[in-house]
Curated annotation (Swiss-Prot):
PROSITE patterns for this protein: ISOCITRATE_LYASE (PS00161)
Broad class of where this protein is predominantly found: other
Keyword field contains Lyase: yes
PANTHER family: BIFUNCTIONAL GLYOXYLATE CYCLE PROTEIN (PTHR21631:SF3), ISOCITRATE LYASE/MALATE SYNTHASE (PTHR21631)
Catalytic activity, EC: 4.1.3.1
Residue numbers covered by motif Microbody targeting signal: 574-576
Keywords associated with the record: Glyoxylate bypass, Glyoxysome, Lyase, Magnesium, Metal-binding, Peroxisome, Tricarboxylic acid cycle
Family of this protein: Belongs to the isocitrate lyase/PEP mutase superfamily. Isocitrate lyase family.
Name of the protein described by the UniProt record: Isocitrate lyase
Gene Ontology molecular functions: isocitrate lyase activity; metal ion binding
């Protein structure tokens, strides 16, 4: 006789804890924070991927802070403005004036890879490179926050009231490039970012194999669906870790010229095809292969490709249909009727497939239309892509349900492009936040803007919805400018160059690195020594004899008259 199975109480308790956690996750997702977020998985899926040991992450507190900051800017039609930070010095100086921090993959690639091998921004560095830089800066933020607290709690109330408080814990948004590979690579990268201190991460829609800086040529896009998978993978990892890390979706569709595949119908309307029937059966890849077999190389191959492209008369399918209608026999009114019908059926928001487009074209009488998107494929197999703001808008529509901000990479600071993109994306997703790269790759002086227009550029596009704006490489360029000009002057004038260019300017501007021992935390660790040794230490770093005492004394040196009343200066306590 079969015996009935009795479920042990331990199993029931396990299931009870699991279901309670599932309900907790579902309630979290139902909060205001995620009202715009779409997930193709369930709360049960997330909890199943978690371990039994619940963990918390400091970066989550900063992620919530970043979200509040950005939503406040969005509500006020203003922007969080920041730039790429290179090191702890920069990140602590930025904290006094800015409300977010950016960590650039370009800067890391050129100055701080985990292998110490520098190079251009091709995302070919180890995938822990940017997370390591995030940790470097996040540790510095926490350290200077601790140091400030010790300093302030050593002051009287009156002294604290006169000493500005600096919020060093500004949220960091980091460059996740393309996610560094497949789904599991993206998941592991995002886990690293959370553990290392990132409050936000951006991921772009370029191919991870051919990734380039957004302002280089030769960019290859992945299909819309593949990038959505990257965003979903990132969100899933954040959900598994129980964090609210801000996710930024970047598109390079404005300037991209190639795309990996034609698998997604949302990309079809931007893929280029050959329209010259004389090239039927003569693919570019085949022509180049024959030329290489014949011994041609370099410039000869390039000339052959240029000639083939010129002959191919590349067009999108819609352009091909439009031209065919306009060149067909018939009255002008008949042509206009067909053109209107085509435009109505093939508008960008409908994202019709090429197969659907061909069916519509045939119904309009275009039965023998020659258009072939395989013929112009590159030797690597990539399809030709017609990049545009509209292509970026279509991708923005697709990415918005899976991201918190949308970023369109551009080739110039163009207000018309910004306006078109913002209105286009918001026509479908009115509440989505937008991001903008105030790139140093732009020659701003050649943009046609006046100084006043440059000054107003950030607030102008902020009113369009670009509530997070950043100069990716300002830390890099500022570092280079200061060191180059100082080194040149120092070689010529010696110590006077240092005193005039740096020491006096630090003093004039209240820069706390003037007292660099204090800035680095000597007082803070003296407190440790004294605490361990009962309140006194003969080896305290900031004790009698420290040269930094010189910066607390009045002095009337010749040449210092421009630094204070009658040349007498008393350096106040550090702003820290």
């Amino acid at each position: 006789m079969a015996t009935s199975f009795s479920v042990p109480s331990m199993i029931m308790e396990e299931e009870g804890r699991f279901e309670a956690e599932v309900a907790e996750v579902q309630a979290w997702w139902n909060s205001e924070r995620f009202k715009l977020t779409r997930r193709p998985y369930t709360a049960k899926d997330v909890v199943s991927l978690r371990g039994s040991l619940r963990q918390s992450y400091a970066s989550n507190d900063l992620a919530k802070k970043l979200w509040r900051t950005l939503k406040t800017h969005q509500a006020n039609s203003t922007a969080s403005r920041t730039f790429g930070a290179l090191d702890p010095v920069q990140v602590t100086m930025m904290a006094k004036h800015l409300d977010s921090i950016y960590v650039s993959g370009w800067q890391c690639s050129s100055t701080h890879t985990s292998t110490n091998e520098p190079g251009p921004d091709l995302a070919d560095y180890p995938y822990d490179t940017v997370p390591n830089k995030v940790e470097h800066l996040f540790f510095a933020q926490q350290y200077h926050d601790r140091k400030q607290r010790e300093a302030r709690m050593s002051m009287s109330r009156e002294e604290r009231a006169k000493t500005p408080y600096v919020d060093y814990l500004k949220p960091i948004i980091a460059d996740g490039d393309t996610g560094f590979g497949g789904t599991t690579a993206t998941v592991k990268l995002c886990k690293l970012f959370v553990e290392r201190g990132a409050a936000g991460v951006h991921i772009e829609d370029q191919s991870s194999v051919t990734k380039k800086c957004g302002h280089m040529a030769g960019k290859v896009l992945v299909a819309v669906s593949e990038h959505i998978n990257r965003l979903v993978a990132a969100r899933l990892q954040f959900d598994v870790m129980g964090v609210e890390t801000v996710l930024v979706a970047r598109t390079d569709a404005v300037a991209a010229t190639l795309i990996q595949t034609n698998v997604d119908s949302r990309d079809h309307q931007f893929i280029l095809g050959a329209t010259n029937p004389n090239l039927r059966g003569k693919s570019l890849a085949g022509v180049l292969a024959e030329a290489m077999a014949a011994g041609k190389t370099g410039a000869e191959l390039q000339a052959l490709e240029d000639q083939w492209i010129s002959m191919a008369q590349l067009k999108t399918f819609s352009e091909c249909v439009t031209d065919a209608i306009m060149n067909s026999n018939g009255t002008e009114s008949e042509k206009r009727r067909k053109l209107d019908e085509w435009m109505n059926h093939s508008s960008y928001e409908k994202c019709i497939s090429n197969e659907q487009g061909r069916e519509i074209a045939e119904k309009l009488g275009l039965k023998n239309l020659f258009w072939d998107w395989d013929l112009p494929r590159t030797r690597e197999g990539f399809y030709r892509f017609k990049g545009s703001v509209m292509a970026a808008i279509v991708r923005g529509w697709a990415f918005a349900p899976h991201a918190d901000l949308i970023w369109m990479e551009t080739s110039s600071p163009d207000l018309v492009e910004c306006t078109t993109f913002a209105k286009g994306v918001k026509s479908v997703h009115p509440e989505i936040m937008l991001a903008y790269n105030l790139s140093p790759s732009f020659n701003w002086d050649a943009s046609g803007m006046s100084d006043k227009q440059m000054e107003e550029f950030i607030p102008t596009i902020a009113r369009l919805g670009f509530c997070w704006q950043f100069i990716t490489l300002a830390g890099f360029h500022a570092d280079a400018l200061v060191i180059d000009t100082f080194a040149r002057d120092y070689a010529r004038r010696g110590m006077l160059a240092y005193v005039e260019r740096i020491q006096r300017e630090e003093r004039n501007n209240g820069v706390d690195t003037l007292a660099h021992q204090k800035w680095s935390g000597a007082n803070y660790y003296d407190r440790y020594l004294k605490t361990v040794q009962g309140g006194i230490s003969s080896t305290a770093a900031m004790g009698k004899g420290v040269t930094e005492e010189q910066f607390k004394e009045s002095w009337t040196r010749a040449g210092a008259g421009n630094l204070g009343e009658e040349g007498s200066v008393v350096v106040a306590k550090s702003r820290m």
